[in-house]
Amino acid sequence: MRGKVLALVILFVCAAPPLLSAATPFVVQETYRGLSLGAIGLRPGVKLDIAPLETGKAMARLKEAIDILHRKSPFSIRAIETLQSAGNVVIVYDPHFPKSRFSGLTIAAYFPEYYQAGGSSKQFVTVVGRYGAKWPAAELAAVLVHELVGHGMQRYRGRLEHVRTIDLECEAYLYEERAYQDIGLDKLSTEMIKFRRTLEDNWCKTFRMHTRRSHPSSVALWERLNPDVPGILKVYLDYIEVLRKNGAARKAIDIERREGLRR
């Protein structure tokens, strides 16, 4: 599963999706468990690489994924409720997403500027595309946590401007890892092993190196089938603060922007 969706991981900072407004003609729009759900109808004449799920079925899949989180992942729901206290939490089904130029199967992505409603409240927006609507609900639930909780909480805490992309993704992957634990997916399956390797050996590699150097007693938080995500996140906060203060994060972000990897 994870090998198919790696394309989603940097879209929230580097892509420029079509900007929707509060007047966007959603064919379906409703509030579900405090979340604003909206579906965009397929534009006439548009040809896609796969047949998108019918809007009603796509919305039902989103609700099923949300229900799974409410039943099984109070850790994730508490974070979503934090976002709800600060603004509007929006999940949009857009069958046109992603555009064909993106490689891989992009399931969902967090776009801070995808949808702008009237007023000054923050919008925490995750877009689920035509692939994501067909994804199994349990896996989709964890991807929603990655995008909405992981990247949404980063915006809530003001981290998007001073944390390197690799570290933003590390944090989002940690939230996703915790969701997989809560949902009860088989952590010894081939796909979960691939996910764990991507988490540890790619996105969180430099963070884990920092942990070994500066917090050796915390290495044990990783060394189990189900890593202690809340404990790891406490160490992570120290790590990103070190990078902010010593200027390493700013230098990396400047390079990302010069290379067009970040807005």
Question: Regions from the language model: what does each represent?
Answer:
Residues L20-A23:
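Boundary at the C-terminal end of the N-terminal hydrophobic targeting segment
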Residues A7-P18:
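Bacterial N-terminal signal peptides
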Residues I183-R263:
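Long, well-structured alpha-helical subdomains associated
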Residues M1-L6:
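Bacterial N-terminal signal peptides that target proteins for export
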Residues G41-K122:
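Auxiliary, metal-adjacent structural segments of Zn-dependent hydrolase domains
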Residues V127-L144:
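Short pre-active-site segment immediately N-terminal to the catalytic Zn-binding motif
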Residues A142-R155:
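Active-site recognition of the HExxH zinc-binding catalytic motif
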Residues V163-R196:
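Post-HExxH zinc-binding segment in Zn-dependent metallohydrolases
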